[in-house]
Amino acid sequence: MSIQIQGVSKQYGTFQALTDIHLDIPKGELVALLGPSGSGKTTLLRIIAGLEEADEGSISFEGEDLTDIHVKNRQVGFVFQHYALFKHMNVFENVAFGLKVRKKSLRPSAEAIEEKVTELLKLVKMDGFAKRYPAQLSGGQRQRIALARALAVEPKILLLDEPFGALDAKVRKELRRWLRKLHDEFQITSVFVTHDQEEALDVADRIVVMNEGRIEQMGTPEEVYENPASPFVYDFLGNVNLFHGRVHKGKLNVGSVELEAPEHKHISNVDGVAYVRPHHLSISRTKQSVDAIPAKVSYSHAVGPVVYVELKRDGTDEYLEAEISKEQFRQLSIQAGDVVYVQPKEVKVFIPEDFVI
């Protein structure tokens, strides 16, 4: 079932939580609402679910306006960060709950409920746990049960609010891959809220980056990571190095170095900032080109197969971070105090007007 969000705004007192949100989600798509705390992502999710009312705008499922339809009639499955399992019910009873409380005319038989719950527990790899209680389960297991319970009522749309936020890193990584596989099998339209960039990039078909109640950018994980539409998106989706200078006719002048800025070839003499990812900075012992920038190594540390090198730009108080392989690090044979040259391999230059939403 597709979702259409048209001109949705929401205000709490003087706080503007959402401003004129427009978003179309095709049937079967897995969309991540990504942003920092206070960006409006959870408010938008709750409005889609019917748990909150928009001040302006409309919510439609498959073209049908559901703005004034109660949450219980929207056929939505909801999974929260903290599981929200009933402590006094065992796993089977938790998963079966949504089916058992249906009005009599719509309630499946006891046999059908048992068959459905058994099938779902197998699906979420929790068969054999039917008689256990939430307190006897790990965080990852509880979240699987919460998802099974949401799927039991056969929702048309699945909404997940920071579903893995309370779990440790390893379990979180396992569960998000499992969720992706589960989604591909069910093909149910799904929207999940997260502030974890890696999670969104790893799981979603499309990412909606939100900031201060507005949508900054929408696109595939590759699009938003490789082609950020604004400084905020660039900065939010991973570490970045900044080079401040002046933009003039397609060049950013950073001290005595010129960096290419072809997208600004018609701009004359304005402030600009070049954004460069750590893995797009190369390091050499000697100056290899005119756009190489002298810097002093201040610190380095290895994380798995990658070495992070912190450097201080020559003649400034600005620090840079480069990300290189262990093999490159061995070949360079650098240590703290060494003067080297860094060269940006991929650069995105923003001017003041780009910093306005």
Swiss-Prot record:
SMART domains: AAA. The complex is composed of two ATP-binding proteins (CysA), two transmembrane proteins (CysT and CysW) and a solute-binding protein (CysP). The keyword ATP-binding applies. Belongs to the ABC transporter superfamily. Sulfate/tungstate importer (TC 3.A.1.6) family. SUPFAM superfamilies: MOP-like, P-loop containing nucleoside triphosphate hydrolases. It is a peripheral membrane protein. Part of the ABC transporter complex CysAWTP involved in sulfate/thiosulfate import. Responsible for energy coupling to the transport system. Its main location: membrane. Keywords: ATP-binding, Cell membrane, Membrane, Nucleotide-binding, Sulfate transport, Translocase, Transport. The keyword Oxidoreductase does not apply. Residues 3-237 form the ABC transporter domain. It catalyses: sulfate(out) + ATP + H2O = sulfate(in) + ADP + phosphate + H(+); thiosulfate(out) + ATP + H2O = thiosulfate(in) + ADP + phosphate + H(+). This is Sulfate/thiosulfate import ATP-binding protein CysA. One of its GO terms (molecular function) is ABC-type sulfate transporter activity. Its EC number is 7.3.2.3. GO terms for cellular component: ATP-binding cassette (ABC) transporter complex. Pfam families: ABC_tran (PF00005), CysA_C_terminal (PF17850), TOBE_3 (PF12857). ATP binds at residues 35-42. InterPro entries: AAA+_ATPase, ABC_SmlMolc_Importer, ABC_transporter-like_ATP-bd, ABC_transporter-like_CS, CysA_C, Mo/tungstate-bd_C_term_dom, P-loop_NTPase, Sulph_transpt1. It is found in: Cell membrane.
